[in-house]
C-alpha cells in the first residue's frame, strides 16, 4: 500500500482544515501541495536517503504561507505576503527495528503536541522561558 496519499496538514476544527495532496515525486523527493493557487499553497516535501553506510536520513520540509491579496491594475491577485519554513532532519540507524521507528514517531508527535513547551512557544510567538 502506498503512503503517498493526501492528508490533513492543518487540523483547524473542520472548517479551516488544510489538506495537501500528492503533486510530484521526482528524484526521490515526494511533494504534497494544498489546493490553493500555487502562490498561496501550503507545501510539504519528504525525502529518504542513505546518509552513510549505517544511517538513513529523512529530510522533511513544510512551507506555511501568510495568505493575502494584492491589487494589480484593479484586479485582486492571490499572493503570499510571506512564508514560514520548517526543516526537519531525522537520522535513523539502518539496524533500527520497526518498533524502534514507531517509538521515534511517538517522540516526534509528543514534541509537537498541543500544550507542550515548543509548540506553545511558537504559537505565542515567543521563546522558551
From Swiss-Prot:
- Superkingdom as given in the UniProt entry: Viruses
**A GO biological-process term:** regulation of translation
Asked if RNA-binding is a keyword of the record, the answer is: yes
The protein's UniProt keywords, in alphabetical order, are:
Capsid protein, RNA-binding, T=3 icosahedral capsid protein, Translation regulation, Virion
User: What GO cellular component is one of the record's annotations?
Assistant: T=3 icosahedral viral capsid
Q: Which InterPro entries match?
A: Levivir_coat (IPR002703), Phage_RNA-type_capsid (IPR015954)
GO terms, molecular function: RNA binding; structural molecule activity
Query: Does the keyword Ribosomal protein belong to this entry?
Result: no
Q: Where in the cell is it found?
A: Virion
Q: Where is this region: Viral RNA-binding?
A: 31-104
- What the protein does? Capsid protein self-assembles to form an icosahedral capsid with a T=3 symmetry, about 26 nm in diameter, and consisting of 89 capsid proteins dimers (178 capsid proteins). Involved in viral genome encapsidation through the interaction between a capsid protein dimer and the multiple packaging signals present in the RNA genome. The capsid also contains 1 copy of the A2 maturation protein. Acts as a translational repressor of viral replicase synthesis late in infection. This latter function is the result of capsid protein interaction with an RNA hairpin which contains the replicase ribosome-binding site.
Q: How does it assemble?
A: Homodimer. The capsid proteins form dimers that assemble by group of 5. Twelve such pentamers are linked together with free dimers. The homodimers binds to the viral RNA via an operator hairpin, but also to many other RNA sequences in the viral genome; this interaction probably shifts the virus from the replicative to the assembly phase and ensures specific encapsidation of the viral genome.
Record-stated family: Belongs to the Leviviricetes capsid protein family.
- The name under which this protein is listed is Capsid protein
